[in-house]
C-alpha cells in the first residue's frame, strides 16, 4: 500500500514535517475517540441517552479521521513531541465543554496549520484532507455547544415550544413541550427521548 501512496503523491513523506503532523493528528483523534466513549458512559449514567449517542457517534467519526491520517503514514518508528489533553472525566456539562474546546483547537488552529505545511511540502492531497476534516471538527464543536446549552438551561427534555419528541428505544413520537417521564409505548424513561430528526 505504501508504494501506491508514493505513486499518488509522487514523493515520500518520510522525514517531513507533514509525516509528524499526520502522526500527531492520528494520536489526537485516537485519544478523542477514547475520551468520547468515556464521556458517553457518564452521559448515560446522568440520564442523557441522546448525548451519550452523540458522543458515541462522534467517537466513531474520530476513528475514521484517525484511520485516514494513518493511511498516509509509511511505516517505521517516528518520534514526535506533542501536547495532549490530560483532563478528567467530569459531569456531562464539563465533558461537553472539554470536547467542544478540543474540537475548536483542531479546526481553528491545528489542522489549518498542518494543511498549510503539507501544501508547502508538496502534499496537496494530505493538505486537502486536513482541511476537509477540519470542517467536520467545526460541526462537532457546534453540536457539542448546542447540547451543552440545553444541559445548562435545563432544556434537554423540555422546550418553550411544542416539538416532536422521539423515543430512542422504540421510535414512539409525541408532540409536546416536554418529553414524557415514561414512554407510553415501551415504558423506557424520559432519558430515551430526543427531539425528532426531520432532515432525512
UniProtKB/Swiss-Prot annotation:
Domain Ferritin-like diiron: 12-155
Subcellular location, record wording: Cytoplasm
Cellular component, GO, one term: cytoplasm
Induction: By exposure to dioxygen and hydrogen peroxide.
UniProt binding sites for Fe(3+) 1: 29, 62, 106, 137
InterPro entries named among the record's database cross-references: Ferritin-like, Ferritin-like_diiron, Ferritin-like_SF, Rr_diiron-bd_dom, Rubredoxin-like_dom, Rubrerythrin, RUBY_RBDX
Binding-site residues for Fe(3+) 3, renumbered to this chain: 167, 170, 183, 186
Example GO biological process: response to oxidative stress
Protein's name in the database: Rubrerythrin
Species name: Porphyromonas gingivalis (strain ATCC BAA-308 / W83)
Gene symbol of the encoding locus: rbr
